[in-house]
Amino acid sequence: MAQNNMNRGLNSRHISMIAIGGAIGTGLFVATGSVISQAGPGGAILAYLIIGVMLYFLMSSIGELATFYPVSGSFSSYSTRFVDSSLGFTMGWLYWAIWLLVTSVDIIISSSVIYYWDFFQFFSPVTWSIIFLAILFLLNIFSVKAFGETEFWLSLIKVATIIIFIAIGVLTIIGILGGKTYGLGNYVTGEAPFVGGISGFLGVLLVAGFSVGGTEVVAVTAGESSNPSHSMPKAIKQVFWRILLFYVLSIAVISAIIPYTDPLLLNKSESVSQSPFTIVFDRVGIAFAASVINAVILTSLLSAANSGIYTTSRMLFSMAEDKQAPKFLGKLNKTTKLPLVSLFVTFIIVLFIIIIAQFKSDIVFSLLNIIGSLVIVVWASSIVAQIRLRSAIKKQNLNPDEVLPYKAPFYPLGPIIVIIALLFLFIGNSIGAILAGDMSVLIRNLSPMIILAIIYFVHKLIRQTKIVKLKDIDLKEHDYN
């Protein structure tokens, strides 16, 4: 079982921003236009409100686990301790693979984004990718606080941009800026507020569900939180409300200023010049809007990559502690208490992927598309672990109030809502392919699940693991001092 002897240098301020930074990225700044175009302003807002409810209960469940067992292994360690070590092995390597690809792709895209400015074209894209990777690696090897501070300020840039955007948008809607009063007329233009029927809404709901992926990284930071029983619940509450408000209010502003029928909203090229944020700033009269949004997108990508390097290295370290990865990956530096070996291995693998992408970029991006959606499996494993934890408390005749530092509200209703939502996201991701009769897409969506099941059962067969009995689950609170 992971003991986690790392330096606990992250406080509530860091943890809140790390989670916010994980969920706010190019999906908000670039993709929201197509969401509004597909489902209309009402459909888009409703979709994010529904996903917001799921996110609240999901993060509450993760918070309950993270405060009771605050280790960097998070989802791998929860499954190992409360369910089955084979499930922990599978979830650990899955989450590691997801973030490894996300990190690599974000760094690769960053090198393309910086090419927006002619001034930075003196290096090739691959050179910029290596420079970005080297900078992020250096930020992670000195102290966990350096990582936390970097992530705090990178995320703060995104948050500040959104707040300024919402404020300028509201002033534009009521006619103070931009020389025109927009009001709420675009909410009822054409077929608005709800467009595209049930299929349009369900499609947007899927986009909304996957767009909040990354918020769960907050669980990994629990292993280096200075006071997880205090900082984790606080961060989770703040993250839910801030992410919900940022997404919903941004969509509300965009919908009021740009009608859903505007072809620019589709932004099929995913160009920064056609980002809904850029369009709104342009209509207000901010000439350098595209440069501003491009800079924010660049910081978003680097912020996500920074979190990715942190997350992948901590997963390797924790799995090594749980004897689910090579032992040498579990070494800590005596001075900094950082898993430098795991960090260096992460650096080498990401560098290798970046180089491979120069010759076979389609393979890297296809892999990310295939396994990236499997983050919902990781979310589901945390719900299963929470249910097992609560069941063990009941089985051992203990009081949840005395065992748990933080209790997720509305249990068991919360986990039930999350399970229903996750089932929908999983089924909905393939239902379009079924209706269209596209077997290749269906196979692409289902094959990762089959591979995961094979990994789980092969590990179970080789290691002869068993599901932990409820009466045998260790319910002693983790001593993080």
Go through the PLM ranges and name each one.
Residues 1-33, 37-42, 55-60, 72, ...:
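Membrane-interface "cap" regions at the ends of multi-pass membrane proteins
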Residues 1-3, 76-82, 86, 107-129, ...:
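Helix-loop-helix connectors at the membrane interface of multi-pass transporters/channels
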Residues 6-7, 12, 20, 31-129, ...:
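Extracellular loop-to-transmembrane helix junctions
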Residues 10, 14-29, 190-253, 257, ...:
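Hydrophobic, membrane-embedded alpha-helices of multi-pass small-molecule transporters
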Residues 77, 84, 116-120, 188-191, ...:
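TM-loop-TM module centered on a large, flexible mid-protein loop between adjacent transmembrane helices
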Residues 125-182, 236-240, 244, 368-381, ...:
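Membrane-interface loop-to-helix entry segments
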Residues 154, 329-336, 379-434, 466, ...:
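C-terminal membrane-solvent junction of multi-pass transporters and transport-like membrane proteins
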Residues 157-189, 253-261, 379-397, 427-434, ...:
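Hydrophobic alpha-helical segments and their helix-loop junctions in multi-pass secondary transporters
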